[in-house]
Amino acid sequence: MEILKAVENVNNRQKRILFKKLYNHFKGELAGKTVALWGLSFKPETDDMSAAPSIDTINMLMDAGCHVRVYDPVAMNATKRRWSTVYCGLDMYDAVKGADAVLLLTEWRQFRIPAWQIVKSLMRTPVIIDGRNVYDGDEIEEQGFTYYCIGR
């Protein structure tokens, strides 16, 4: 049982890492910030959100006073049922309009190679927090973004 508790503790800490990176970037001033999330389901190619990190992430963002905008290719209906105040984008670009940061939570194929200049032009503050280590940080930074990932 101690091993299971340890695993659960690690999983809970992992869910907070992206929020912590965002919190640190904005020096704790998150109230009123708009944060876009790409990917809500537990893994690509499913609408299963039952154990998805997006649930805790959205709740933490809302508790901090953030405006949350999201896009997931298949999990939007579940999101609409769960949170009435979360904006569900029509596509990945609609979700980032006016965003101060984008958090990648699920590595759907369509999120792998976005048109970065379009993303940047739609955002208020070009900050990318890559929760799946999908992107090349140097390439993203060359495009004018501030880039954070996990474990680097």
Question: Over which residues does each language-model region extend?
Answer:
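Structural/interface elements that position substrates and couple domains in central-metabolism enzymes
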Residues: 1-152
